[in-house]
């Protein structure tokens, strides 16, 4: 049995929705145990509420537990072309795992969201830098998801990982195409994890 963690941060719910689609795809793979968790919110609750943050039910992960999984699929929104402070703070607490090599050889993949599309790929590839320092095997999705070839509508999705475009005011929710790409990413990573660890 390969253990897959879908680990995300989501303020307004876009990445949370994508995380559930990623997990749905991963659960299609026989021999994959899939768990969804989120990183802790660092914003004071009253500020989070004033900013329109969405309450989420996923349990909160600890950095130490990352070592328990064979593959980790990270979901992070984009803040100024990079991951937000909440995800950065969480990953900055993995120094002990780095020192012991606890994540070495584990699969790592990333999906993201942006307001208007700016920085979605950079957010994914800059997250890869942290995964590389841990010796994780980075898993992009390439162009195997056929939805990536559809240019008839505004949509997220890159060969690096699934993405969604939320719109400047956050009102646009992930489209069916974007969710399909996210499901593909989950299924693809889980399939590799089972082959390597199942």
UniProtKB/Swiss-Prot annotation:
State the EC number(s).
1.6.5.2
The record's keywords, sorted A to Z, are: Flavoprotein, FMN, NAD, NADP, Nucleotide-binding, Oxidoreductase
Any stretches that span the bilayer, and where are they? none
What sort of enzyme, by top EC class, is this? oxidoreductase
User: Which cofactors are reported in the record for this sequence?
Assistant: FMN
Q: Can you give the residue ranges of the Flavodoxin-like domain?
A: 4-189
What is the free-text note on the cofactor?
Answer: Binds 1 FMN per monomer.
Pfam families in the record: FMN_red
Query: Is this entry keyworded tRNA-binding?
Result: no
Q: Where is the signal peptide?
A: none
Write out the catalysed reaction. a quinone + NADH + H(+) = a quinol + NAD(+); a quinone + NADPH + H(+) = a quinol + NADP(+)
Give the protein family: Belongs to the WrbA family.
Q: Name the positions where FMN binds.
A: 10-15, 78-80, 113-118, 133
Q: Extract one GO cellular component term from the record.
A: membrane
Annotated NAD(+) binding lies at 12
- Molecular function GO labels: flavin adenine dinucleotide binding; FMN binding; NAD binding; NADH:ubiquinone reductase (non-electrogenic) activity; NADP binding; NADPH dehydrogenase (quinone) activity
UniProt name for this protein: NAD(P)H dehydrogenase (quinone)
Q: Can you tell me which residues bind substrate?
A: 98
């Amino acid at each position: 049995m390969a253990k897959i963690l879908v680990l995300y941060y989501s303020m307004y719910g876009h990445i949370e929705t994508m995380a559930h689609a990623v997990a749905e795809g991963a659960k299609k793979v026989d021999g994959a145990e899939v768990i969804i968790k989120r990183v802790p919110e660092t914003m004071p609750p009253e500020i989070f509420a004033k900013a329109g943050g969405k309450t989420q039910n996923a349990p909160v992960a600890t950095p130490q537990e990352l070592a328990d999984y064979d593959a980790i699929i990270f979901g992070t929104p984009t803040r100024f072309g990079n991951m937000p402070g909440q995800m950065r703070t969480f990953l900055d607490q993995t120094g002990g795992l780095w020192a012991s090599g606890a994540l070495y050889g584990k699969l790592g993949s990333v999906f993201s969201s942006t307001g208007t599309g700016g920085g979605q790929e950079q957010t994914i590839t800059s997250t890869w830098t942290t995964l590389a320092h841990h010796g994780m095997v980075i898993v992009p999705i390439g162009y195997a998801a056929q939805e990536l070839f559809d240019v008839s509508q505004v949509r997220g999705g890159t060969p690096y990982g699934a993405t969604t475009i939320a719109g400047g005011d956050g009102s646009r929710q992930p489209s069916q195409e974007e969710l399909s790409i996210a499901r593909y990413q989950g299924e693809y990573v889980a399939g590799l994890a089972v082959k390597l660890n199942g």
